[in-house]
Amino acid sequence: MQAGARFQRRRRQLQQQQPRRRQPLLWPMDAEPPPPPPWVWMVPGSAGLLRLSAGVVVPPVLLASAPPPAAPLLPGLPGWPAPSEPVLPLLPLPSAPDSAAAAAAHPFPALHGQWLFGGHSPSLGLPPSSTVELVPVFPHLCPSALATPIGKSWIDKRIPNCKIFFNNSFALDSTWIHPEESRFFHGHEKPRLLANQVAVSLSRPAPASRPLPTVVLAPQPIPGGCHNSLKVTSSPAIAIATAAAAAMVSVDPENLRGPSPSSVQPRHFLTLAPIKIPLRTSPVSDTRTERGRVARPPALMLRAQKSRDGDKEDKEPPPMLGGGEDSTARGNRPVASTPVPGSPWCVVWTGDDRVFFFNPTMHLSVWEKPMDLKDRGDLNRIIEDPPHKRKLEAPATDNSDGSSSEDNREDQDVKTKRNRTEGCGSPKPEEAKREDKGTRTPPPQILLPLEERVTHFRDMLLERGVSAFSTWEKELHKIVFDPRYLLLNSEERKQIFEQFVKTRIKEEYKEKKSKLLLAKEEFKKLLEESKVSPRTTFKEFAEKYGRDQRFRLVQKRKDQEHFFNQFILILKKRDKENRLRLRKMR
């Protein structure tokens, strides 16, 4: 009993010694006495976030991260003492009449708030789901006397073109942002919380496992210094765009005014500015961006305001390149191909004498040599000897003999044409245009009947060595570059290939059978010529005649042994018959 009482006393002492957590206080604007100025939020040395319930209207809140230090204070602010900690406005606060003047007359104690770092904390007593979260991100602005809140929590995230910086304490969700007129933080421009005018935009991304909307700070020029007593317009707007799933917070700072600069020294604070462009959480609905859209890592970007002139310029379609498409398309077409022996790759030549490598099994085309073919010595020989040039060289030699006679004929034709043109005179421009059109139009192609095209296609399959025991996809690389391949459409090609395979299986089976019979006969001739005795073994025979061409015609080892054993059995039967005859004769 005494031990239990001691334990209870010790527990109470420890509870009394521990500092109690203070909940953040809410200051309504219509309360008496009036609250402090509605445009200041005291921020700790490192970045954080505040979470408010989604069902609650955004209240006029003033939260201080810690009690303000006694010194140093910013000079020139006699009404409301502001510490030298960096200040950042995060919420739009409706201003009551003469709230700033009343705040100057009534100093307020420092309020205790809690900054959440990178996660949902139950300390504020809010549900984890359906929340609006504010994440202060500090952009690189102009230099100032205020201390920078950058600590070890900043890390740089790099993408191939440039760097961006944000706090590693937060798990920012990925958002799609149109990249035009955007600004990234580069490596030498680490973000600082400095004095300038900023625009705060909240965006709620698509529903995810852990929704965490981001806050983007866009710098804007300062029209003038802000003083100790500021008035904000009485009609602040909290615009919620449900279609874009984004919330925008804005306060118009145009009517900022204060006492004369002779009495108070100007100080640049961070104030809210109107926002017209929210952070987009879905891909931009633009034809150009949809065509060239590439998946990007999660990036934090600063967007500038788009003018109406810029919108009109964006709507104009980009200039299309044209002119030499037909010529380049003709030159880039594949002309010939040869398979590389012992590999799935094929060497393909185009019309402009370029070479690329095609893998039909992987459906992959590569300009550079694949890793499988880099150590091949015969590849250079294949590339230097294209098959389509071999065919062209043969008729070129035949035509070289009759070139002299053709030159003479051409000279005569040119002379006769000159005489005709001199007699007829210059033609009219309309007639010249017609002649040009007539020369440009290609001659009509004569389409062969279907039966002839089918026979040509089958001949191609036979010549190219298409296997009947393979599939269409595997044998496609053998025939795809042949001009006869284009005689039929895709459906007809597959139908004829299936018919060819069915008939070809029977033919190949017969061919294999006939080849095996021929090999068997040649093997028997070898056995007879070798004068094998019934006592010789197959191992001895193979060592002696293994290099003979007739021995190699039978490819399988089992067939060789089978034929050898059959021949040995025949020899043994002959020996038995001969012995029986000799016994009968005796």
Curated annotation (Swiss-Prot):
<dbReference type="Pfam" id="PF23517">
    <property type="entry name" value="WW_TCERG1"/>
</dbReference>
<dbReference type="InterPro" id="IPR001202">
    <property type="entry name" value="WW_dom"/>
</dbReference>
<dbReference type="GO" id="GO:0005634">
    <property type="term" value="C:nucleus"/>
</dbReference>
<keyword id="KW-0677">Repeat</keyword>
<dbReference type="GO" id="GO:0070063">
    <property type="term" value="F:RNA polymerase binding"/>
</dbReference>
<feature type="region of interest" description="Disordered">
    <location>
        <begin position="378"/>
        <end position="448"/>
    </location>
</feature>
<feature type="domain" description="WW 1">
    <location>
        <begin position="148"/>
        <end position="181"/>
    </location>
</feature>
<protein>
    <recommendedName>
        <fullName>Transcription elongation regulator 1-like protein</fullName>
    </recommendedName>
</protein>
<dbReference type="Pfam" id="PF01846">
    <property type="entry name" value="FF"/>
</dbReference>
<feature type="region of interest" description="Disordered">
    <location>
        <begin position="1"/>
        <end position="30"/>
    </location>
</feature>
<feature type="compositionally biased region" description="Basic and acidic residues">
    <location>
        <begin position="411"/>
        <end position="421"/>
    </location>
</feature>
<dbReference type="InterPro" id="IPR036020">
    <property type="entry name" value="WW_dom_sf"/>
</dbReference>
<feature type="compositionally biased region" description="Basic residues">
    <location>
        <begin position="7"/>
        <end position="23"/>
    </location>
</feature>
<feature type="domain" description="WW 2">
    <location>
        <begin position="339"/>
        <end position="372"/>
    </location>
</feature>
<dbReference type="InterPro" id="IPR036517">
    <property type="entry name" value="FF_domain_sf"/>
</dbReference>
<dbReference type="InterPro" id="IPR002713">
    <property type="entry name" value="FF_domain"/>
</dbReference>
<feature type="domain" description="FF 2">
    <location>
        <begin position="515"/>
        <end position="570"/>
    </location>
</feature>
<dbReference type="GO" id="GO:0003712">
    <property type="term" value="F:transcription coregulator activity"/>
</dbReference>
<feature type="compositionally biased region" description="Basic and acidic residues">
    <location>
        <begin position="428"/>
        <end position="439"/>
    </location>
</feature>
<dbReference type="InterPro" id="IPR045148">
    <property type="entry name" value="TCRG1-like"/>
</dbReference>
<feature type="compositionally biased region" description="Basic and acidic residues">
    <location>
        <begin position="378"/>
        <end position="387"/>
    </location>
</feature>
<feature type="region of interest" description="Disordered">
    <location>
        <begin position="281"/>
        <end position="344"/>
    </location>
</feature>
<feature type="domain" description="FF 1">
    <location>
        <begin position="450"/>
        <end position="503"/>
    </location>
</feature>
<feature type="compositionally biased region" description="Basic and acidic residues">
    <location>
        <begin position="306"/>
        <end position="317"/>
    </location>
</feature>
